[in-house]
Amino acid sequence: MEIEDLDGIMYRLHSSIVKNTSSKAAVDMAVYDLYAQRFGAPLYQLLGGAGDTVETDITISVNPVPQMVADSLEAVQQGYKILKIKVGKEGLADVARIAGIRKAVGSGIQIRVDANQGWTAKEAIRIITAMEDKGLNIDLVEQPVPAHDLDGMRAVTKAVYTPILADESVFSPEDAAEIIRTRAADLLNIKLMKTGGIWQALKICSLAEMYGVECMIGCMLESKLAVSAAAHLAAAKRVITRADLDGPSLCKADPFTGGPLYENGVIRMTDAPGIGITRVPAFV
């Protein structure tokens, strides 16, 4: 098949195997890279070209409060203006964590909370309400309840003012459609390793645009190779209003060259064709 037959390639890819979304994403990203190179343009421009910069948060892992405060202050000193705080294991103790971080970093830093499915619906309502009562000004709470509990997540979304972001609950366009239909969450988190790549992620973007639902683009602990593809998608689509693309910043070493530039929490797109990666090391 010729690279210009993008839809044909993607139909064949996604009909070949069930699940295995990370493997599909690897092929998908390579195809989109070649497709954009064929036309001599950066991928984000071919996908829509909404902007050439993406601001990302950085993750602060669960630790004792003093360590989390220190990690947060270090991230702010590095230039990050958005922190994503991991919680979800100790109930109201999580409120103390967020309160300590908010006091340390001040009101000018945006804070997001990721519970990673760690609460029941009732716990989530109690904890998020406590954060609201303390005026902690949380941008969003990510996946407060188990992925399968859409009824519980809908109850949380309805009960609190803080926006709720669905993550593990949304892998496919079908998942996104169900969350939108039932109003189970306010926001959708797109990850290429969940969707199977850019092709399916674009479908989620289109659904979200139709119904006025904003999206975040996220990543696992991924290298610059994979995160660069996600950054191109984020730069292309206005419906993607938030980014959690800190994977390369959390890696000990970056063996790849080329691609978007990472500067103090801002990802800057370049004019390089395709995804922009110019060297991929040989792994042994």
For each feature predicted by the language model, list its residue ranges.
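Metal- or metallocofactor-binding catalytic centers and their adjacent structured scaffolds
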Residues: 1-38
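Flexible, glycine/charged-enriched surface loops at secondary-structure junctions
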Residues: 3-7, 42-46, 138-144, 219-220, ...
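A generic structural signal for well-ordered alpha-helical segments
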Residues: 35-36, 157, 208, 234
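N-terminal small/glycine-rich loop or linker at the start of catalytic domains
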Residues: 37-64
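Active-site beta->alpha loop and helix N-cap motifs at the rims of alpha/beta catalytic domains
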Residues: 41, 60-69, 74, 91, ...
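Gly-rich Lys/Arg/Thr-decorated short loops/hinges at beta-loop-alpha junctions or inter-strand turns
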Residues: 52-56, 75-82
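Catalytic core of soluble alpha/beta enzymes
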Residues: 85-226, 252-262
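Flexible C-terminal active-site loop/helix
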Residues: 220-284
